Amino acid sequence: MARVSRGVQAHAKHKKILKKAKGYYGARSKVYRVAKQAVIKAGQYAYRDRRQRRRKFRRLWIVRINAEARNNGLSYSRMIDGISKADIEIDRKVLSDIAIFDKTAFAKIADQAKQALVV
């Protein structure tokens, strides 16, 4: 059996990793071994942070809703409870946008939530 040189494949593989590591500092963008580790770690961070981004946005929306709900005489939990009892189907993302950009509409939603809590 003939010996196989992997020159072309190895060069392509190295080139692919070094391309992904472009912009990294020092050896992380120059040396294949180090660059490969850096690219793998970057992938792990990216995977983790895509999930954390969703959590962070939800927390932000809740903070915004709570702030505006308190301006309308409700706490966040009472507001959400009232909205669900009033059969208003609106998610936190949209509700936080309304709280920021359309305070009168948010006040109307808050009033409906208050009425649903009383009944």
From Swiss-Prot:
GO terms for cellular component: ribonucleoprotein complex; ribosome. Keywords: Ribonucleoprotein, Ribosomal protein, RNA-binding, rRNA-binding. Disulfide bonds: none annotated. GO terms for molecular function: rRNA binding; structural constituent of ribosome. The keyword Amino-acid biosynthesis does not apply. GO terms for biological process: ribosomal large subunit assembly; translation. Transmembrane segments: none annotated. Binds directly to 23S ribosomal RNA and is necessary for the in vitro assembly process of the 50S ribosomal subunit. It is not involved in the protein synthesizing functions of that subunit. PANTHER family: 39S RIBOSOMAL PROTEIN L20. Belongs to the bacterial ribosomal protein bL20 family. This is Large ribosomal subunit protein bL20. It comes from Ruthia magnifica subsp. Calyptogena magnifica.
